[in-house]
Swiss-Prot record:
Species, as recorded: Saccharomyces cerevisiae (strain ATCC 204508 / S288c)
Source superkingdom: Eukaryota
Gene Ontology MF annotations: FAD binding; heme binding; nitric oxide dioxygenase NAD(P)H activity; oxygen binding
Entries under PROSITE patterns matching the protein: GLOBIN (PS01033)
Domain Globin: 165-298
CDD domains reported for this sequence: Mb-like
Note: Present with 195 molecules/cell in log phase SD medium.
Name used for this protein in its record: Uncharacterized globin-like protein YNL234W
InterPro entries: Globin (IPR000971), Globin-like_sf (IPR009050), Globin/Proto (IPR012292), Mb-like_M (IPR044399)
Family: Belongs to the globin family.
Signal peptide: none
GO terms for biological process, alphabetical: cellular response to nitrosative stress; nitric oxide catabolic process
Amino acid sequence: MTGEKILHSQLLTNSDMSSGNVHHTKPMMYNVTLPSYNSSSIGPVDNLKINERPGSHDHSMRSEMSSKNSGSDFMPQSISRSEGSVYQVKIDRGDSPNTEGFDFKVNARDLLLLRMSWDILLREYLTPKELKVFQALLYSNKHITSTERPYLNTAPDGMISKTIDPTARPRKTKQRDNDNKVDTALFCSQFYDNLIAMDPLLEEYFPSLKHQAVSFCKVLDSAIDNLENVHVLDDYIVKLGKRHSRILGIKTVGFEVMGKAFMTTLQDRFGSFLTLELKNLWGQLYSYLANCMITAGKDPMEKIQPDFSYNGDSVVLNFSIPKLAMHDISTVNKLQMVKTKNATIPHNITQVPTNKIPTEILLDNSSTPIKSDRESTPPISPKGSGSTKPSIGSSTVVESNTKKNNYDEKIHLLQKTAQQKNCSIM
C-alpha cells in the first residue's frame, strides 16, 4: 500500500485541546496519510530498508550506551514510577529471579488504548471509521462521560465492539490469527531495520536477529492479550530471561538498544498520532517485560551474614580466630634423657660406633699361575703345613676363639676348590 492515500475524517479541535477538553465539531475531509507512514520527511516506511537513513537513526550501540536518555527513553531496571493510571511497581523480594518483583496495571481506558494501537500496528490499513474511533479515544479526556464522547459508545452495538473487541472471537481462533498477523506484519520488518540502523554489527553478533524481532512482537502480542493479569506470563518470561542471559548472552545494554528501536518504530508507524500518553503506555509495558527478563536471567546468590558491626561513622571488622587441632601429649612417647659428660642424649636411642675399622681378607693360590699380575702373590699353604695361617696384606684380622675352627675349615675348603679350578680367590 506504499504511495496510497485514503480520505479520512479528522475531527477539528479548538484551543481547549491543551486543557484536555475536546469539542467534537463538524468533521472535515483531509487528505492524510495512514499511520503506517512516517510523519517525517523520510517518506514511506519502505525507505527504511535502504542505506540512506535519517541522521537520527545513524548511531552505534556505543553512543547509545553512553548517552543520557530522556524521560521518554527506556532504561530497564530503572523505571519505577507512577504516571496517571498506569504504574509499574518494583517490589523488594530479595535476589530471587522472579517476575513477581514487578507489576504492571492499567485502567480500562488505557487497556483499550493499548489494544487498539497494537491492532493498528499489525494491520496493513484502517478504515475511516476505525481511524476516527482511535483518534477520538486518543485525544479525549480521561474523565468525560459517554454523552460527551459520541464515538466511544461502549454499548454492545458500539463501534469499538464491532471493530476491535478482543472478546468477540474465540480464544484459540484469535490466537492463531494473531500469530499469522505477527509473522507477516510490516511492523516486525520495520523494527528489525531500526535495530540494524542503530548498530550494523548486531546482525553479525546475532545471526538470528530477524527471527528475534518477530519473537519480540509475539511476546508483546501475548502481553497485550493478558493485560488484565500480566503475571499469567511469569513462567514464560522467566524462561525467556534465562535463555537471553545464559545462552544468547544479552545484557542490560541490549534491552536498552531494543527499547530505543521499538520506540523509533512506534514513531514511524503512528507519526503525529503517537502522543505522549501513548508513548508512556508503551514505554511502561516494554520496561516491565525487559525488567522481568533481566531479573530472571540473573543467577541466584547465596546470602551470607556479614561479620562486622557498625559503630557510628566507623565499621569494625570482627575476624574469628580459627580453632587449632589439639593433640594428646600423654600418647606421645617421651624420650628418656640420660645425662652424660658432654651432653644429654636419649637413653632409648641405639648409638652406632663411628670409629669401626673395616676388615679385609685376601686369599690367593699361585700353584698354577694364569696371569702375570698374579705371579707375585704368595701361595697359601694348605692345612697341616708349616704356615697354617693365610697370607694377609696390610689389613689385620681379629678372630675370636669360638669361631677359629669354623674359619679354618672354610679356608681349607676354598683352597681345595681353587686348586681344582686353577684359579685364585681374591
